[in-house]
Design a protein with these regions (language model features):
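Structural signature of eukaryotic scaffold interfaces centered on beta-propeller domains
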Residues: 59-66, 107-116, 148-169, 211-232, ...
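Structural motif
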Residues: 75-81, 126-131, 177-184, 241-259, ...
Length: 351
């Protein structure tokens, strides 16, 4: 899953699933909005794109085709992305019509996509049901959140049966305090379903942490996938000296795996299954940076997690050990989030 604006090298992506991915036409890229702070952005493209990957099922029984929706976004604009084509350019869909105006929040901080391809977004104080209408991303529903004194940076859907015993998927938001909250999409009611726990001495690969024992903070995003009834979850986190304050945090993000069983319980329990590793540059990869941070958007595909950094970089992260390769530099495009359907293929790392 790549947005390639200025090629900076690549790592091989997983190839467990093949198919073709259709997006909208071209269109100019936009200067991204900035995190949860006010910034300007212009978009001149008039294109639309659904970001829909279609693959035919294999094996006996003739499984029907499945649509995989995948997106990335800046503070103010939505793009479709192609998980199967590392060299494919992003396709600008359009600007969010509920962001940046009078009385509106300044930036969309993340989005989530359910198994039906429906898109929901989140900002500092609200959630939105999003629909693509021509070259505009319309906020069809806007619900104000009773914000628990921390900014929401991450959004995903918990697959059916995780937080609800029915076939219903549930929206889950993550905040700077390292807390996960289910979100009622009818009225915005928040219910806590865990935290990321505390920072260990090291990541299991010999890389130590300066803030051992402190609560993990969410660096930017979470992603959950159904995985055929064996759900998988990941988060990009960081260690900070005084959580939930974002000052003085480690300049290297860490990939963690989520215990989807513990997520079901209401409360402040740790739901971290395993620290996969710090996002350090893999041997043989290009790019000047030796570590990666501010992964405000992540989306999983096969054995990789793709990170969209607010530092204008897109990286491919190994979901086993957190090692990372720079895939693209995106000057003047500051990523705020990413989302992929809960039906996206994933190769679960060993526990």
């Amino acid at each position: 899953m790549i947005l390639l604006l200025a090629t900076a090298g690549a790592c091989a992506a997983g190839t467990a699933t093949t198919g073709t991915f259709g997006t909208g036409g071209g269109g100019n890229t936009a200067n991204g909005g900035g995190g949860a702070t006010s910034s300007s952005q212009s978009s001149t493209g008039s294109d639309v794109g659904g970001g829909t990957f279609t693959t035919s099922g294999t094996g006996t029984g003739g499984a029907p085709p499945v649509d995989f929706a995948a997106y990335a976004h800046t503070g103010k604009a939505l793009y479709s992305i192609d998980p199967m084509a590392p060299s494919a350019a992003p396709k600008l869909i359009g600007n969010f019509d509920c962001i940046g105006g009078t009385g509106q929040d300044s930036a969309m901080t993340d989005l989530a996509v359910n198994q039906s391809g429906d898109i929901w977004g989140i900002s500092d104080t609200k959630i939105y049901r999003l629909t693509v209408e021509g070259s505009v991303v319309h906020c069809a529903t806007t619900i104000t959140l009773p914000n628990p004194n921390a900014v929401f940076y991450g959004l995903t859907f918990a697959p059916a049966g995780i937080l609800d015993d029915s076939t219903k998927e549930v929206l889950v938001a993550g905040n700077t305090a390292g807390q996960l909250w289910s979100v009622d999409t009818t009225n915005g009611t928040l219910t806590q379903h865990g935290t990321f726990g505390n920072v260990p001495a090291n990541d299991g690969h010999g890389h130590s942490y300066d803030n051992k024992g402190k609560a993990w903070e969410l660096s930017g995003d979470i992603v959950f996938l159904a995985n055929g009834g064996n759900p998988v979850g990941f988060a990009a986190v960081r260690d900070c000296p005084n959580p939930p304050s974002t000052s003085g945090c480690n300049a290297t993000d860490t990939l963690i795996a989520i215990d989807m069983t513990k997520l079901k319980s209401v409360g402040s329990q740790s739901v971290t299954l395993k620290v996969r590793g710090q996002m350090l540059k893999s041997a043989g990869c290009s790019g000047a940076d030796t570590a990666y941070e501010r992964m405000l958007g992540i989306a999983a595909w096969n054995d990789k997690v793709y990170g969209f950094s607010h530092n204008s970089a897109i990286v491919e992260i190994d979901n086993n050990d957190g090692s990372a390769c720079l895939v693209a530099s995106t000057p003047n495009v500051f990523w705020n989030g990413a989302g992929v359907t809960t039906l996206a293929p994933v190769i679960k790392p060993p526990e």
